[in-house]
């Protein structure tokens, strides 16, 4: 009842939008326990997603960022009030007054909830200085982030916090707030548990190490939860493009029984044959959520450094092949400039019909380590520029 009164009062209040946003977020964080908040957000998300798909069935397979912007959110909740509960109806009404849509609000709540647990202190040391020197950082593989005692900070919030919270906050800021990958909101638990690769800045004068990059590493044993094998990423809409030398490289790496993977003609067929024939299951993993921090230039540097450290760390850990999903042009342009056997696509698809291709592919860790062994950030950028220029010339020739 107290929440209803607070929401009613806030709804009628003519506060500036940013102030109303903050008051609403604080109210929700104070009122609900973490698991209660998650259940509420998931319930309303599912309700509105199904409703929007019923209204616009031609967009049923699009991403949440497309689906939740098909209709003005305030118009949606006025024309189709929630039937979940009176509380949900009133909450959505206030959200509609100050946020783009429900998922935008969910993301901001999760970010605020983590920052509220570890508030910045006025007398703390200044934000860490992020150098463009490879030796100032180190990569590591953490088997279970939920069990580690390591405390770190991140550039956008220089306050010590558990590693799992730092990874989650980084994922929220980069992928959900930045890239609008709202599907990750209901899967935030994957950022808080399990095996993760991390890149840390050595704590020189800082109070604790600074997390500048991370990635989720999932073993073959949990392949049923892999994004690579989710229906959206393994269907006939994907263009199959696994190269002939990929088959040869897989044979050389001794991954299968029988030793040669059967030739395939579609991505679903390839995925099925891979699962049936794979015998060296310890050599294969999926790498997702490669997250980097900092401003635009720092992110490019940490993207280079994270890949360099990732390949080395996973190769040393005994992995041979890594499944990955990539949209990042900077990464793809670099891969075009190195040995073709170091990274190869298995398929590509324009998931949202917006002209942006998403690629499924494989990192060959042994070859990737060689590709990065004699290259620094300057050389990396030079290779990317040359690759981009070559690609532009090739496109011009076909016009």
UniProtKB/Swiss-Prot annotation:
Please list the reactions this protein catalyses. a fatty acyl-[ACP] + S-adenosyl-L-methionine = an N-acyl-L-homoserine lactone + S-methyl-5'-thioadenosine + holo-[ACP] + H(+)
What does UniProt give as the signal peptide span? none
GO terms (molecular function) for this protein are: N-acyl homoserine lactone synthase activity
The answer, when asked if ATP-binding is one of the entry's keywords, is no
Q: Which UniProt keywords apply?
A: Autoinducer synthesis, Quorum sensing, S-adenosyl-L-methionine, Transferase
Q: Name one GO biological process term.
A: quorum sensing
Name the top EC class. transferase
From what superkingdom does this record's organism come?
Bacteria
What protein family does this chain belong to? Belongs to the LuxM / VanM family.
Q: What does this protein do?
A: Required for the synthesis of an autoinducer molecule beta-hydroxybutyryl homoserine lactone, which binds to LuxN and thus acts in bioluminescence regulation.
Q: In its UniProt entry, what is this protein called? A: Acyl-homoserine-lactone synthase LuxM
Organism of this sequence: Vibrio harveyi
């Amino acid at each position: 009842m107290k929440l209803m009164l607070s929401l009613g009062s806030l709804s009628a209040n003519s506060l500036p939008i940013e102030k109303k946003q903050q008051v609403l977020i604080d109210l929700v964080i104070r009122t609900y326990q973490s698991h209660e908040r998650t259940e509420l957000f998931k319930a309303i998300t599912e309700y509105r997603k199904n409703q929007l798909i019923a209204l616009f069935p031609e967009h049923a397979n699009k991403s949440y960022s497309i689906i939740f912007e098909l209709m003005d959110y305030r118009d949606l909740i006025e024309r189709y009030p929630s039937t979940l509960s009176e509380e949900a109806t009133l909450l959505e009404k206030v959200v509609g007054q100050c946020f783009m849509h429900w998922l935008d609000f969910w993301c901001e709540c999760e970010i605020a909830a983590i920052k509220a647990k570890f508030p910045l202190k006025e007398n703390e040391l200044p934000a860490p200085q992020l150098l463009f020197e490879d030796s100032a950082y180190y990569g590591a593989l953490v088997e279970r982030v939920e069990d580690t005692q390591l405390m770190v900070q991140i550039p956008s919030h220089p306050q010590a916090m558990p590693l799992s919270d730092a990874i989650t906050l980084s994922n929220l800021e980069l992928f959900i707030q930045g890239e609008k990958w709202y599907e990750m909101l209901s899967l935030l638990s994957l950022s808080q548990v399990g095996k993760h690769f991390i890149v840390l800045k050595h704590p020189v004068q800082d109070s604790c190490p600074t997390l500048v990059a991370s990635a989720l590493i999932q073993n073959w044993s949990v392949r049923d939860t892999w994004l690579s094998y989710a229906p959206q990423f393994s269907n006939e809409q994907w263009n199959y493009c696994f190269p002939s030398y990929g088959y040869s490289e897989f044979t050389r790496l001794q991954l299968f029984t029988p030793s040669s993977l059967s030739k395939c003609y579609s991505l679903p067929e390839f995925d099925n044959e891979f699962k049936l024939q794979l015998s060296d299951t310890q050599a294969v993993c999926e790498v997702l959520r490669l997250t980097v921090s900092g401003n635009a230039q720092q992110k490019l540097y940490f993207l280079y450094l994270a890949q360099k450290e990732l390949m080395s760390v996973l190769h040393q850990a005994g992995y041979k092949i890594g499944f990955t999903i990539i949209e990042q042009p900077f990464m793809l342009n670099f891969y075009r400039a190195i040995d073709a056997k170091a990274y190869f696509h298995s398929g590509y698809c324009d998931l949202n019909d917006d002209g942006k291709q998403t690629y499924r592919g494989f990192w060959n860790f042994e070859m990737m380590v060689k590709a990065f062994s004699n290259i620094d950030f300057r050389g990396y950028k030079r290779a990317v520029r040359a690759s981009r220029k070559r690609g532009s010339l090739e496109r011009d020739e076909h016009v």
